[in-house]
A protein has these predicted regions:
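Glycine- and acidic-residue-biased ligand/ion/polar-headgroup-sensing regions
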Residues: 59-79, 88
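Extracytoplasmic
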Residues: 38-43, 62, 79, 95, ...
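A short, N-terminal "cap"/entry segment at the start of jelly-roll beta-barrel domains
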Residues: 2-42, 75, 91, 99, ...
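Histidine-centered metal-chelating micro-motifs
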Residues: 53-55, 73, 90, 94-103
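Short acidic-glycine-tyrosine-enriched beta hairpin
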Residues: 33-37, 48-49, 78-95
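Ligand-binding loop in jelly-roll beta-barrel domains
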Residues: 81, 96-121
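N-terminal targeting signals for Sec/Tat export/insertion, comprising classic cleavable signal peptides
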Residues: 29-61
Length: 129
C-alpha cells in the first residue's frame, strides 16, 4: 500500500505538466517484478478529454499501451505517426522520446491502459525536448 501511495504521489506531481491539464491518470497496480531483479511493474489508465494532448516526454521504461475507448494519436521521435482505436496497441522503448500523444477527437474522450516495466524507484515520466 505504501508503494501505491508513493506512485499516486509521483503521478500526481509529474502528471500535471506532462499530460493535458484535464487528463485523468489512475494508478491501478505497482508491483516489484521478483523475477527481474531491480525492476517493477506499474499499470495506469489515462483518460484524455476531447482534444487533449500531452507534452513531449519520455518514460525511461518499457511502456505497453492498450487503447480502451476512443482514438488516440501517438508518435515517438523517428517513428511513424499512428492513430489507434480500441483494442490496438503501442510500444515505447526506454530511450524513446514521446513527441505526439493526443486524443484524435474533439468531441469524444479517449482512454488507454499503460503497463510500464521500469527500474525500482525511478520516475514514471520525465520531461524531454
Amino acid at each position: 500500500m505504501k508503494r501505491l501511495s508513493l506512485a499516486l504521489l509521483l503521478l500526481g506531481t509529474l502528471g500535471t505538466p506532462l499530460f493535458a491539464q484535464s487528463a485523468k491518470v489512475t494508478p491501478l497496480l505497482d508491483k516489484p517484478l521478483t523475477g527481474i531483479p531491480g525492476k517493477e511493474g506499474l499499470m495506469i489508465t489515462v483518460t484524455f478529454p476531447p482534444g487533449a494532448s500531452d507534452m513531449i516526454h519520455r518514460h525511461n521504461a518499457h511502456a505497453f499501451v492498450y487503447v480502451l475507448e476512443g482514438r488516440i494519436i501517438m508518435q515517438v521521435r523517428g517513428g511513424e505517426l499512428v492513430t489507434l482505436g480500441p483494442g490496438q496497441t503501442f510500444y515505447e522503448a526506454p530511450n524513446d522520446i514521446h513527441v505526439v500523444g493526443k486524443n484524435a477527437s474533439s468531441t469524444e474522450p479517449a482512454k488507454f491502459l499503460v503497463f510500464f516495466v521500469k527500474d525500482k524507484g525511478a520516475p514514471v515520466l520525465v520531461p524531454a525536448r
